[in-house]
């Protein structure tokens, strides 16, 4: 199906099949469509609302065209990632949580990008921490295999996305592409915590990942609007495990955490996020640092469970709490900085 035929269909609020969506996405991602056509397609899909078949088709093409990271093994390799767009400007919880996971013995293939609507994306934070981002897929694989953690800078692995960059920027609205990033990890992880900007997306994205072969995934959205587990409100979870999807709410108290306001956790820039994370993963001298530490524990605990490194959410949170207090997570961040610095010298020689 070509994009003109697809536009005729979606204007009539008719869904595309998975294969039809693959056809259109390949045309978009290989530069065969005009910016006007891409913009019209994205807006039409938004107004119609994307079906599960359409998302599966789009994700499969993005994965097919990605510059992939090859790992020695994918057993238990996990990613913790969010769509962004929640408007809260909270510090980089999922990125900080990744280092707790690695310190706990998990293997983490973290996928992320620069901020679009927020104040600090995962790439912005890591750059502020002195971590070199412009790695080849092979170099990222060496980080993950050697240290148990590596960062895949989305723009380096999804170069075909450049064809949609202009229309997305000009539209200035959330589109299909906002939900594709967390679903297109270049290492092909089968274990994830995926935070989304709307509760309505939780079940559909869990079904998408089920169809694409994921093993254990938590798709989450908190009642106070975050694309992650919240200390201040219940969090809705669509969990894919053993090829079955269950849906439930989780209160902080269910996991041994105290409900509390998120006041003091919003940041204005990557440096502020880094300082809060340094405090949270280090000595926690401030009230906000302690609160940030608990937010990290909550989300890292969920990812330990998704990685099958813990038997339950509660067990994951307990393990994350113990690991965070050792200081090993901050050491792991510094290790990654030193490891990538060697690649920077190689790449810039």
UniProtKB/Swiss-Prot annotation:
<keyword id="KW-0460">Magnesium</keyword>
<dbReference type="InterPro" id="IPR017459">
    <property type="entry name" value="Glycosyl_Trfase_fam3_N_dom"/>
</dbReference>
<dbReference type="InterPro" id="IPR005940">
    <property type="entry name" value="Anthranilate_Pribosyl_Tfrase"/>
</dbReference>
<feature type="binding site">
    <location>
        <position position="227"/>
    </location>
    <ligand>
        <name>Mg(2+) 2</name>
    </ligand>
</feature>
<dbReference type="GO" id="GO:0000162">
    <property type="term" value="P:L-tryptophan biosynthetic process"/>
</dbReference>
<keyword id="KW-0057">Aromatic amino acid biosynthesis</keyword>
<feature type="binding site">
    <location>
        <begin position="110"/>
        <end position="118"/>
    </location>
    <ligand>
        <name>5-phospho-alpha-D-ribose 1-diphosphate</name>
    </ligand>
</feature>
<comment type="pathway">
    <text>Amino-acid biosynthesis; L-tryptophan biosynthesis; L-tryptophan from chorismate: step 2/5.</text>
</comment>
<feature type="binding site">
    <location>
        <position position="94"/>
    </location>
    <ligand>
        <name>Mg(2+) 1</name>
    </ligand>
</feature>
<comment type="subunit">
    <text>Homodimer.</text>
</comment>
<feature type="binding site">
    <location>
        <begin position="85"/>
        <end position="86"/>
    </location>
    <ligand>
        <name>5-phospho-alpha-D-ribose 1-diphosphate</name>
    </ligand>
</feature>
<keyword id="KW-0808">Transferase</keyword>
<keyword id="KW-0328">Glycosyltransferase</keyword>
<dbReference type="GO" id="GO:0000287">
    <property type="term" value="F:magnesium ion binding"/>
</dbReference>
<comment type="similarity">
    <text>Belongs to the anthranilate phosphoribosyltransferase family.</text>
</comment>
<keyword id="KW-0028">Amino-acid biosynthesis</keyword>
<keyword id="KW-0479">Metal-binding</keyword>
<feature type="binding site">
    <location>
        <position position="82"/>
    </location>
    <ligand>
        <name>5-phospho-alpha-D-ribose 1-diphosphate</name>
    </ligand>
</feature>
<dbReference type="InterPro" id="IPR036320">
    <property type="entry name" value="Glycosyl_Trfase_fam3_N_dom_sf"/>
</dbReference>
<feature type="binding site">
    <location>
        <position position="82"/>
    </location>
    <ligand>
        <name>anthranilate 1</name>
    </ligand>
</feature>
<feature type="binding site">
    <location>
        <position position="122"/>
    </location>
    <ligand>
        <name>5-phospho-alpha-D-ribose 1-diphosphate</name>
    </ligand>
</feature>
<dbReference type="InterPro" id="IPR000312">
    <property type="entry name" value="Glycosyl_Trfase_fam3"/>
</dbReference>
<feature type="binding site">
    <location>
        <position position="113"/>
    </location>
    <ligand>
        <name>anthranilate 1</name>
    </ligand>
</feature>
<feature type="binding site">
    <location>
        <position position="228"/>
    </location>
    <ligand>
        <name>Mg(2+) 1</name>
    </ligand>
</feature>
<dbReference type="GO" id="GO:0005829">
    <property type="term" value="C:cytosol"/>
</dbReference>
<protein>
    <recommendedName>
        <fullName>Anthranilate phosphoribosyltransferase</fullName>
        <ecNumber>2.4.2.18</ecNumber>
    </recommendedName>
</protein>
<feature type="binding site">
    <location>
        <begin position="92"/>
        <end position="95"/>
    </location>
    <ligand>
        <name>5-phospho-alpha-D-ribose 1-diphosphate</name>
    </ligand>
</feature>
<feature type="binding site">
    <location>
        <position position="168"/>
    </location>
    <ligand>
        <name>anthranilate 2</name>
    </ligand>
</feature>
<dbReference type="InterPro" id="IPR035902">
    <property type="entry name" value="Nuc_phospho_transferase"/>
</dbReference>
<dbReference type="Pfam" id="PF00591">
    <property type="entry name" value="Glycos_transf_3"/>
</dbReference>
<keyword id="KW-0822">Tryptophan biosynthesis</keyword>
<comment type="function">
    <text>Catalyzes the transfer of the phosphoribosyl group of 5-phosphorylribose-1-pyrophosphate (PRPP) to anthranilate to yield N-(5'-phosphoribosyl)-anthranilate (PRA).</text>
</comment>
<feature type="binding site">
    <location>
        <position position="228"/>
    </location>
    <ligand>
        <name>Mg(2+) 2</name>
    </ligand>
</feature>
<dbReference type="Pfam" id="PF02885">
    <property type="entry name" value="Glycos_trans_3N"/>
</dbReference>
<dbReference type="GO" id="GO:0004048">
    <property type="term" value="F:anthranilate phosphoribosyltransferase activity"/>
</dbReference>
